[in-house]
Regions:
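Hydrophobic alpha-helical connector segments
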Residues: 65, 76-110
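Short terminal interaction segments
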Residues: 151-159
Length: 159
């Protein structure tokens, strides 16, 4: 029986969704798309398997959400680092170097690197292949914009 002062906090659907993606990332990183069971993900996060399908529809949709989150984490980190590094220098080489070091930091979370590898391994599936391609394109474009490397250096006007 709960005491009068007991407070029960309920997660919002978005918080629960984020928790499921985090749990799925760990499972998919280790076992891959084909080798991961939705039951293992549900158990890891403490929800029912039907609830996973209520949130994501299919296992593939959940995998794609985890892949998207992985790439978005890297992309946002690069953009943040580039903004901070730009205070010291707006040289594209400097900014790219700082983003490269940030990537090494991101990869200390082995699940991030493993999930990226598992995403590539799952590219036999056309939907997953399209998502991986789109995420890499967004990442490339983001790095190019954030670093200024997308534009050739302009020569001074000789006039």
């Amino acid at each position: 029986m709960r005491g009068v002062n007991a407070v029960q906090t309920r997660q919002t659907a978005e918080e629960r969704r984020e928790g499921v993606i985090a749990a799925a990332t760990k499972e998919f990183a280790v076992h891959g798309f084909a080798g991961t069971s939705t039951m293992a993900i549900a158990k890891r996060v403490g929800v029912s398997q039907p609830y996973l399908f209520q949130l994501f529809g299919t296992k593939k949709d959940l995998f794609i959400a985890a892949v998207h989150e992985c790439f978005e984490t890297v992309r946002l980190r690069f953009e943040s680092v580039a903004r901070d590094a730009r205070r010291a220098s707006d040289d594209p080489e400097h900014l790219l170097q700082q983003m490269g070091m940030a990537y090494c930091d991101v990869l200390t979370d082995r699940n991030m690197l493993r999930l990226q590898m598992q995403a590539y391994a799952a590219c036999d599936d056309a939907d997953i292949r399209r998502v991986v391609h789109d995420e890499w394109t967004k990442l490339y474009d983001s790095v190019a914009r954030a670093s200024g490397a997308e534009h050739p250096r302009r020569l001074p006007d000789p006039r």
